[in-house]
């Protein structure tokens, strides 16, 4: 099994605690309000903490239709969240799993930087194409910005 790592940082004017709540702790209630068309459905099995599984179905017309995400760890004090995509067509047939490590860091101006590292565990020596990574970055950034706008407005 191969491993390929990719990092993404997004700066926000919203405080670290509020962003962490919006993208991690309250994500199941925030996304339907902030980005109503982002998900067709989300089935949550668990209480949101470690071991929780979310079965996510994406809307018609999306190049990806499903993903199952397991929460591995949530630390509310350190503002960290670890999860793993364990199933769904998002794995593209050549990825075993996608491990994600997220940390939200406060900035001196009262805003925050969200740092995400994704580790793609691939089958054999497969490599995730750069265009797939760029597409994922664009989708994740758009969803983040929708949540950020919602948090600013509310």
From Swiss-Prot:
Biological process according to GO: abscisic acid-activated signaling pathway; defense response
SMART domains named among the record's database cross-references: Bet_v_1 (SM01037)
Keyword flag Nucleus: no
SUPFAM superfamilies: Bet v1-like (SSF55961)
Outcome recorded upon mutating residue 43 to D: In Dau C 1.3 and CR16/Gea20
GO MF annotation: an example: protein phosphatase inhibitor activity
S-S bonds: none
Entry's Gene Ontology cellular component terms: cytoplasm; nucleus
Pfam families tied to this protein: Bet_v_1
Gene3D superfamilies per UniProt: 3.30.530.20
Record keywords: Allergen, Pathogenesis-related protein, Plant defense
Family of the protein in this entry: Belongs to the BetVI family.
Subunit annotation: Homodimer.
Name of the protein described by the UniProt record: Major allergen Dau c 1
Species assigned in the record: Daucus carota
């Amino acid at each position: 099994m191969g491993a390929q790592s990719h990092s993404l940082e997004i700066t926000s004017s919203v405080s670290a605690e509020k962003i962490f709540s919006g993208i991690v702790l309250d994500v199941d209630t925030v996304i339907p309000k902030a980005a109503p068309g982002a998900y067709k459905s989300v089935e949550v099995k668990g209480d949101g903490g470690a071991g929780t599984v979310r079965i996510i179905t994406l809307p018609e017309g999306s190049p990806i239709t499903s993903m199952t995400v397991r929460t591995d760890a949530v630390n509310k004090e350190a503002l960290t969240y670890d999860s793993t995509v364990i199933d769904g067509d998002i794995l593209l047939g050549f990825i075993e799993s996608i491990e994600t490590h997220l940390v939200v860091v406060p900035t001196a101006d009262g805003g925050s930087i969200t740092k995400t590292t994704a580790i793609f565990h691939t089958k054999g020596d497969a490599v995730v194409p750069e265009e797939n990574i760029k597409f994922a970055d664009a989708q994740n950034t758009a969803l983040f910005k929708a949540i950020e706008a919602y948090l600013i407005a509310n």
